[in-house]
Amino acid sequence: MICAKLYYDNDLLWRFKIEGHAGYANHGSDIICAAVSILVFNTVNSITELTDEQVSINKVDQKKALIDCEFPNRKFGKHSNEAELLLKAMILGLNTIRETYGENYIKIQNIGR
């Protein structure tokens, strides 16, 4: 199962940690894992390249299917509107995957909200 932990402070997402394999299909054929991976990495890359938001990637582990990413300035209430939109789009995508395929494959935890 994929577990997405979304960390909030004052309603701003300042960190996310996404870990695990969906187990929907065999390695290399799992469309849920592929969808989550591209969604998350595209969001991080877009924020890095298209906004002034500070991004800190704490850990990436391909074997564990883990990414731990932090946006330090957001914890202090500083954020860009562009990054906010991109993060909301990522969350919308994660929720859509969960609603489409079920909670047996992806769990989303909102922490601090």
Question: Residues of each region from the PLM?
Answer:
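N-terminal intrinsically disordered, cationic/polar leader segments
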Residues: 1-31, 45-113
